[in-house]
Structure formats: structure tokens, C-alpha cells
């Protein structure tokens, strides 16, 4: 796909090698997309063949929309009637999440048995495009009535950093994507560039900077209009 100027952006990332759908032999599909399981199997093969490597891996299994049929996707999730009526595609998304969990469990299990030191950084890129009615059922109120904290939490996605060797353990880390590369480098013990050092200092003041709001070091959830002059 060429959306978001990917064709040019991927070149600027300057990876030694790029792999796409056509590079996966006999992939296991879920719906019409390559499954997380097949995706991870390509990584296993690559890391077995190379002494060291860095992957930026984007999976497609759970891409919207969620009314594409159930090919190779077992039905496990049944929502309450009010949520089902608000968005009849939500169950498919949640079943896809279950398949992702199973593949992720396999990924972590695989690298936990490897002698080569391995660091996995896992994060989602955005919330699923379910209907506003679905989210309003979850909140029990109109989306227009959400607090800044609720808006930010709706857009939040899970992430973790895992290693098959000892690293500092942290829980409930608040961070926006612009800082994640810095945290990864710090966790891996890699040197920071000057720009990354700037981001590391900024993170101590404002750990989440997003288009829909900000989180301060003392845990305040603020709109842009609520930022102090110093924060701006």
C-alpha cells in the first residue's frame, strides 16, 4: 500500500532488507491477511540465519474492517446484546485479538529458549475503528461528554518491552510513541543521539504528547488549551 507515503518513508528508514506479503511462502491466512503466526515464523527463520538483527515488524492480521468473513478465525467471543447491537463487527475484532495473543505467546516462548540475547518491543499503532455507538455503550455516555483523560485512554494502546535476559521491570508506564524509541535504546543499553537525549529530558516533564491531549509528569491529563506557558 502507498498510503501515508509509505513507499518513500520506508526507504528513509534505510533497512538492509524489506520483506512484504510476496516474500512469505505459503502463508497461513486469517480472513484475507497474513496471520501473526506466519509473520512471526518469518522472523524466527531470519534470526536463525543471522548473528544479530533488528526488525521493525508491522503485522496485518487485525487490519480493519471486521465484516470480511471468518476464514481460519474461530468464534470465541460473544458480546452482550447491547454491545452487539451497537457494532456487529466488534466480535470479529476481539476474536482477532485472541489469535494475536496466542501467536504472541508462541513468539515469547520461542525467544525465551534462545541463547542469543533478544529484546522484543511490542505495541499497537491505533484503536480499532468501531462505531461511536459501541464506545458510547462502553462509557455509558456520549463521546462528547468524555473527560480529557477518557479521550486519551480511548486512544491508548498496550505496549511492553520483554527480554530473555534481566532488564529493569516497570509497570503502568505512561508514554507516547515519540518517546518509545528512546525507552527502547535505554533498555537495550544503546547510546543515544543528541535528539534522543533531548526527548529523554522532555519525557521527564511531559511523558505523553498526542494530538488529542497531554499527560504531565505529575499525572495530569490536559488539553492543549490547558497547558501553562512554560509547558507550551
What are the roles of these predicted feature ranges?
Residues 1-232:
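Solvent-exposed soluble domains appended to multi-pass membrane proteins
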Amino acid at each position: 500500500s502507498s498510503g501515508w507515503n509509505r513507499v518513500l518513508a520506508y526507504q528513509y528508514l534505510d533497512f538492509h532488507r524489506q520483506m512484504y506479503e510476496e516474500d512469505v511462502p505459503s502463508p497461513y491466512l486469517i480472513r484475507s491477511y497474513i496471520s501473526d503466526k506466519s509473520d512471526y515464523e518469518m522472523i524466527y527463520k531470519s534470526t536463525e540465519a543471522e548473528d544479530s538483527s533488528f526488525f521493525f515488524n508491522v503485522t496485518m492480521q487485525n487490519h480493519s474492517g471486521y465484516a470480511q468473513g471468518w476464514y481460519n478465525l474461530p468464534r470465541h467471543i460473544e458480546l452482550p446484546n447491547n454491545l452487539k447491537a451497537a457494532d456487529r463487527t466488534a466480535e470479529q475484532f476481539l476474536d482477532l485479538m485472541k489469535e494475536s495473543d496466542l501467536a504472541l505467546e508462541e513468539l515469547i516462548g520461542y525467544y525465551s529458549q534462545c541463547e542469543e540475547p533478544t529484546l522484543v518491543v511490542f505495541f499497537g499503532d491505533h484503536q480499532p475503528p468501531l462505531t461511536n455507538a459501541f464506545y458510547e455503550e462502553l462509557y455509558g455516555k456520549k463521546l462528547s461528554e468524555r473527560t480529557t483523560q477518557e479521550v486519551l485512554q480511548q486512544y491508548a494502546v498496550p505496549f511492553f518491552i520483554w527480554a530473555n535476559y534481566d532488564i529493569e521491570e516497570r509497570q503502568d508506564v505512561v508514554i507516547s510513541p515519540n518517546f518509545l524509541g528512546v525507552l527502547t535504546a535505554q533498555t537495550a543499553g544503546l547510546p543515544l543521539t543528541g535528539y534522543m537525549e533531548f526527548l529523554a529530558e522532555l519525557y521527564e516533564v511531559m511523558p505523553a504528547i498526542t494530538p488529542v491531549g497531554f499527560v504531565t509528569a505529575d499525572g495530569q491529563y490536559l488539553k492543549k488549551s490547558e497547558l501553562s506557558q512554560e509547558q507550551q
